């Protein structure tokens, strides 16, 4: 399962669809361009030789399905804080399972999950180039090349 994601460190969100407690997330691999460019910054500063990360015809496209979803959220990666607790990398740093996370604690504390769900509840995160997707579920995700 993890081999599809571990081969690249840059992934971009293409599509997210939620229906009937199934969350489908389609992502595309970002590839570092062979062509570099100079980037101008504020106050007359610049960085030379920057290579953009792009989705190309060579990019892999992957679908990750989370069944039995109880809650999910999408956060702009610029505003996301690191998770407390332990983290198990499933697909490199891209797909992770969290234990004792602040998000899992928040969802359980502010919902009826503890009262209504008998199965163990898990917190997964997808750490993409521009988005962090947190998922609370009672089942393992599946990953497939599309």
Which ranges hold each PLM region?
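Surface-exposed, interaction-prone regions used to assemble/regulate multi-protein complexes
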Residues: 1-146
């Amino acid at each position: 399962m993890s081999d599809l994601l571990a081969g690249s460190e840059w992934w971009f969100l293409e599509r997210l669809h939620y229906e009937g407690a199934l969350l489908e997330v389609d992502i595309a691999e970002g590839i570092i361009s062979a062509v570099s460019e100079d980037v101008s910054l504020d106050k007359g500063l610049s960085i030379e030789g920057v290579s953009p990360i792009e989705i190309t015809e060579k990019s892999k496209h992957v679908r990750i399905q989370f069944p039995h979803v109880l809650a999910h959220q999408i956060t702009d990666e610029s505003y996301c804080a690191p998770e407390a607790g332990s983290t198990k990398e499933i697909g490199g740093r891209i797909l992770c399972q969290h234990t004792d996370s602040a998000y899992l604690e928040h969802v359980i504390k502010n919902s009826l999950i503890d009262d209504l769900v008998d199965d163990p509840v898990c917190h997964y995160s997808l750490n993409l180039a521009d988005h962090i997707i947190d998922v609370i579920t009672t089942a393992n995700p599946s990953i497939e090349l599309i």
